[in-house]
Structure formats: structure tokens, C-alpha cells
């Protein structure tokens, strides 16, 4: 009997091993009322090398939507400049989904590559709600760096967590998440 692992992928090739890194900034975390403000995307290979940094889009929202953000978002999105960028943006949610879908289709095949990021299950919920066609392009599995962080704190408390700036802008958060996973790869998964 063979001990070679089997995979559910139709073809295992370099393209099928890619990771689709996404980060969203939202008006809050309440899926029933909050919305996406910013989305960035980066494609990496299995070794965490960046293949291409994709669009980093700020979606226009009304002042009414911005006024109803929770206190944390009002403070942090105000400090980061995101609130003002949202006011000035000309990009609709529909346009943003179309642009992101074109980008991800250029680099991945439908249903093959996982969504990656930090606490990315939250991003996935908002993608399913607001950008379902984009979300459906991705595999149902996710690579969540925050899971590794939490397990490392418990199982390897002597290994320091990588330092992060936490600027709360989408592209910067993705870049930090990729670096964080690289760090865990050499310290925890050695």
C-alpha cells in the first residue's frame, strides 16, 4: 500500500499551490450592517514568494455609512487616512469586485487556491456577502496566520511573535501577514 499522500486537486502544479492573500478594512465586524471599505490582494507561491501585488482599492461609501462606523473604526480609519480616502474614492463595490476578479483569474484557476491572511475568516464572511463571485473563485479552505499565532503562543511560548506595525491599511496588513508566516515557517515549522 502506498504512503504517498493524495490530494483533491485535479492537477498539482505550481499554479495550483498559490495563495491568494486578501485583507479588507470594514466599517466594523457586524456582518448584518457593516461593509467593506478597502481591499488589497497579493498572490504568493507555496514558498511565500510574491508573484504579484494586485490592486489595492478603496471603495466609495456615503457619509452616512462612515458616520455609522463603530468607535474603533472611526478612530483608526481616521488616523490611517482611510476615511478620507473612502470619501474621495470613485470606485463602486461592483467595480472593485470586477477588478479583483480579473486579477485573481489571471493568477489562479477557479476553486483551487485558498484565501490567506490574518483572521481571514472575517474577510471571507464579508466577501461572501459583498463580493460573492470573487469569493466563489477561491477554494473553500483558508490559510489563517492567526491560527498559527495562537497555537504558537500556547505550544511554543518561548518563541517571540513577529512584531507588526498594525497600520490597519489593507496592503500593509497583507505584507505583514506574509512576513509573519515566513517567520513561523523558520521558527515553528522547522
UniProtKB/Swiss-Prot annotation:
Its EC number is 3.1.15.-. InterPro entries: Exonuclease_RNaseT/DNA_pol3 (IPR013520), Oligoribonuclease (IPR022894), RNaseH-like_sf (IPR012337), RNaseH_sf (IPR036397). Pfam families: RNase_T. The active site is at residue 140. Gene3D superfamilies: Ribonuclease H-like superfamily/Ribonuclease H. It is an enzyme of class 3 (hydrolase). One of its GO terms (molecular function) is 3'-5' exonuclease activity. GO terms for cellular component: mitochondrion. Residues 19-181 form the Exonuclease domain. Keywords: Exonuclease, Hydrolase, Nuclease. GO terms for biological process: RNA metabolic process. Belongs to the oligoribonuclease family. 3'-to-5' exoribonuclease specific for small oligoribonucleotides. This is Probable oligoribonuclease. It comes from Dictyostelium discoideum (Social amoeba). The gene is rexo2-1.
